[in-house]
């Protein structure tokens, strides 16, 4: 998967200076980060709606659009895919692959940590119950 996102990222970088009249990517770069963010949010909402409606095929299609728009926003912000992979590795080393860092842990110093042998196990998400946020 990361190879596909790497290729997409490189294609986005190559397309950003094309003619906005013929390139959707160039048009997004021309319109700036706020338009990119709006498109990303729209795609995220579409993924959520399709998932709630149980439309798996639509979730797949909209997820591809979501990843495209995320990659465009990364490129605009100067974020490279390997920056994200490095953060994911750091989090995995701390908590396991299927966990999100709590907000209090976000302020921990960045450490170039080697892969930790004793990680938390990967957990199945199907058995978890949804909690309502307040």
Swiss-Prot record:
Kindly state which keywords UniProt assigns to this record, in alphabetical order: Amino-acid biosynthesis, ATP-binding, Cytoplasm, Histidine biosynthesis, Hydrolase, Nucleotide-binding
Q: Which reaction equation describes what this protein catalyses?
A: 1-(5-phospho-beta-D-ribosyl)-ATP + H2O = 1-(5-phospho-beta-D-ribosyl)-5'-AMP + diphosphate + H(+)
Its GO biological process annotations read: L-histidine biosynthetic process
CDD domains (UniProt xref): NTP-PPase_HisIE_like
Pathway field: Amino-acid biosynthesis; L-histidine biosynthesis; L-histidine from 5-phospho-alpha-D-ribose 1-diphosphate: step 2/9
Q: What is its EC number?
A: 3.6.1.31
Which InterPro entries does the UniProt record give?
A: HisE, PRib-ATP_PPHydrolase-like
The record's listing under NCBIfam families reads: histidine_hisI
Q: What HAMAP family does the annotation carry?
A: HisE
Protein name, per record: Phosphoribosyl-ATP pyrophosphatase 2
Q: Which gene encodes it?
A: hisE2
């Amino acid at each position: 998967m990361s190879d596909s996102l790497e290729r997409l990222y490189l294609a986005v970088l190559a397309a950003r200076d094309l003619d906005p009249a013929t390139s959707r990517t160039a048009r997004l770069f021309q319109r700036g980060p706020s338009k990119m963010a709006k498109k990303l949010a729209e795609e995220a909402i579409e993924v959520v709606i399709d998932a709630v409606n149980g439309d798996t095929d639509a979730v797949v299609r909209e997820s591809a659009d979501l990843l495209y728009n995320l990659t465009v926003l990364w490129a605009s912000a100067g974020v490279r895919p390997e920056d994200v992979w490095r953060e994911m590795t750091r989090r995995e080393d701390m908590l396991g692959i299927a966990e999100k860092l709590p907000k209090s842990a976000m302020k921990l110093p960045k450490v170039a940590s080697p892969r930790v042998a004793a990680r938390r196990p990967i957990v199945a998400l199907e058995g978890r119950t949804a909690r309502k946020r307040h």
